[in-house]
Each structure stands twice: as structure tokens, then as C-alpha cells.
UniProtKB/Swiss-Prot annotation:
Its EC number is 1.1.1.103. This is L-threonine 3-dehydrogenase. It holds the Pfam family ADH_N. It is found in: Cytoplasm. InterPro entries: ADH-like_C, ADH-like_N, ADH_Zn_CS, GroES-like_sf, L-Threonine_3-DHase, NAD(P)-bd_dom_sf, PKS_ER, Zn_alcohol_dh. Catalyzes the NAD(+)-dependent oxidation of L-threonine to 2-amino-3-ketobutyrate.
């Protein structure tokens, strides 16, 4: 195996990514080197491409980016015991310290010292990625490489949707991007009574319909209160899944929640936007922030959903070779795509 590999690198502090030859990551005693077969583009990667304010403050240059992937093990460290070369795997993209109170209590997703693959350390937009053995997730034979490559965002959806009991509940999802749609699908399969998803992007609304969401609302044209009445809702929503990061959508969600409603918030909103906290207080709402996946309970649950028949394939709207990565990022930046999966083989 060559000691150099092809990778997408944030090589300059400006808009874009560049394909370069970089060293293959070194494998420590507790590490696993994975030959990447499929990579998916995340919204985080788009922020890095755009070199926005968050990226400028967060991403060291140069950096191999990317964190949504699947592949097979190419090499294992001397102390690795659970995996073998050739095994099909994906990986948890949050590297935790294992030493803080939350880690030692089994709450690794709450680690204060989390490092992100492709953000704080070299990522998976390369022919190889190296992660700790503890972050490796084996992929069952009945799950394809491309579905495994989107397990990271699917895990965000599963973690968000399953934050609260859904059986018999009316659920509002704001934001019909891929994670929002997957969250709505999880809610539907988990026994929710009514599942409503809102957005203002026609392409995303059509994608939600294609994947079988029953109540798809164009918030730029339809009044959510009228939709609720039309589908037989006499009270507000019991559970809200905020996936949009859009202040108007979040405010509308708060307005439409039932007293005692519960909201899981994954969408990253602009800093400093206003909400009416009196409504939160007097409605006695429960707000919960979500970041990433529970380690590793969420992974078990998402694998079970897929093996149980949840078809995520239609959420992948673009399948391209890695050399066409610019086309993939153009599709993502346009807002007129679902997931974009890139093939390294």
C-alpha cells in the first residue's frame, strides 16, 4: 500500500476544497485504518466549502474534511482486538475523551472534549480514514455501502426523533432537508398519530412526499393552523422536531405546540434570534438540544430501523464519482438535493 492517498482538502482559507495527494494517516495501537468506499456530503462540509464565519473560526488549514462514510478495514493497530482487515464498517464521527464525568458515566455523546472527524482531525474525504477502535461500527451484510455512508445524518434524525415518546402523539417537523425527512419517517414508524413536516423549498417538499410523509406543508403558502384543522387536530402538537435552524419556523412551532409539549432541537439557528419565552413558560414546554448521536445506542436503533424495512435510498438524490466532487457540492449548495453520495472505488 502506498503511503500517499488522494483526498479532498481545505487547503486554503477561502471558498472551495481541493483534491490533493496527502500522507495516509498513521495507525496507532488502538486505531483502525479504513479504506473509504463511499462518502456523503454533510451540511457541515458545505459550511467548510463556503468558508463562512463558523468555518473560519473552527477549521484548521490545511485539513482533510468529511465525516460521513463507509468502507472496509485496511489495517488495524497492534492493540485492536474486535475487528479484522476486510470487515465492512462505518464510524462514529465524534471522538470523545473517555475521561470526563459524562464519558465515565456512559454518556459519551455529552463529552465536553469531543473532537470531530473532518473538523478537528483528518476526515473521511480521502481514500483512507483513521479512527479509534472504539468509534468503529460494523455494517451488517444486508445494509449497502451507500446507506451505511449516510448513517451519520440518519443517526442525528433517530436521536432527535426518539428523544421523546412518540406513540399516539402528534408530531411537527420543521425543516424538510434530508435529516428532517428521515426524522419524520422515524416518527411515523415509531407509532406517531399525525406527522406534519414544513419547509419553504419546493424541491425538499416534493422529496418529503416521495418518501411517504403524509402531511407536507409549504410554510410560504399554507397556514399551519388550517392544516391542523383539516387533518383533525383539535389541540396542538405533542412533539416538535426542529430541524431547520430557521427562526420563523421555530417560532411557529412554539405557537402550535400543545401545553406540556416537548421540542427536540437539532437545527442550528442564527445567533441572537428572538422567541417569546412567555409562551415557552406558560405552555410549560420542554426544550432539548440535540448534537450528534447517543453512543452507541442510536447506532443500534438506526441499524434496526433499516433492517426492519425503512427504505432510505430515495433520500439519496445524487450518486457521483469522487472526481466529480464539485458537482456534488454544487447540488448541495443549491438546496435542490437530498443526500449526495460520492464513490471512491
Amino acid at each position: 500500500m502506498s503511503n500517499m492517498m488522494k483526498a479532498l482538502v481545505k487547503a486554503k482559507p477561502e471558498v472551495g476544497l481541493w483534491m490533493e495527494n496527502v500522507p495516509v494517516p498513521e495507525v496507532g495501537p488502538n486505531d483502525v485504518l479504513i479504506r473509504v468506499k463511499k462518502s456523503a456530503i454533510c451540511g457541515t462540509d458545505v459550511h467548510i466549502w463556503n468558508w463562512d464565519q463558523w468555518a473560519q473560526k473552527t477549521i484548521p488549514v490545511p485539513m482533510v474534511v468529511g465525516h460521513e462514510f463507509s468502507g472496509e478495514i485496511a489495517e488495524i493497530g497492534s492493540a485492536v482486538t474486535r475487528y479484522h482487515v476486510g470487515e465492512r464498517v462505518s464510524g462514529e464521527g465524534h471522538i470523545v475523551c473517555g475521561k470526563c464525568r459524562n464519558c465515565r458515566a456512559g454518556r459519551g455523546h455529552l463529552c465536553r472534549n469531543t473532537l470531530g472527524v473532518g473538523v478537528n482531525r483528518p476526515g473521511s474525504f480521502g481514500e483512507f480514514v483513521c479512527i479509534p477502535e472504539s468509534n468503529v461500527v460494523p455494517i451488517p451484510d444486508d445494509i449497502s455501502d451507500e446507506i451505511a455512508a449516510i448513517f451519520d445524518p440518519f443517526g442525528n434524525a433517530v436521536h432527535t426523533a426518539l428523544s421523546f415518546d412518540l406513540v399516539g402523539e402528534d408530531v411537527l417537523v420543521t425543516g424538510a432537508g434530508p435529516i428532517g425527512i428521515m426524522g419524520a419517517l422515524v416518527a411515523k414508524r415509531s407509532g406517531a398519530r399525525k406527522v406534519v413536516i414544513t419547509d419553504i423549498n419546493p424541491h425538499r417538499l416534493e422529496l418529503a412526499r416521495k418518501l411517504g410523509i403524509d402531511h407536507v406543508v409549504d410554510a410560504s403558502k399554507e397556514n399551519l393552523a388550517d392544516v391542523m384543522k383539516a387533518i383533525g387536530m383539535t389541540e396542538g402538537f405533542d412533539v416538535g422536531l426542529e430541524m431547520s435552524g430557521a427562526a420563523p419556523a421555530f417560532r411557529d412551532m412554539i405557537d402550535k405546540m400543545n401545553n406540556g409539549g416537548k421540542i427536540a432541537i437539532l437545527g442550528i439557528a442564527p445567533a441572537g434570534f428572538e422567541i417569546d419565552w412567555n409562551k415557552v413558560i406558560f405552555k410549560m414546554l420542554n426544550l432539548k438540544g440535540i448534537y450528534g448521536r447517543e453512543m452507541f445506542e442510536t447506532w443500534y436503533k438506526m441499524i434496526a430501523f433499516v433492517q426492519g424495512g425503512l427504505d432510505l435510498a430515495p433520500i439519496i438524490t445524487h450518486r457521483i464519482g469522487i472526481d466529480d466532487f464539485r458537482d456534488g457540492f454544487e447540488a448541495m449548495r443549491s438546496g435542490n438535493s437530498g443526500k449526495v453520495v460520492m464513490d471512491w472505488m
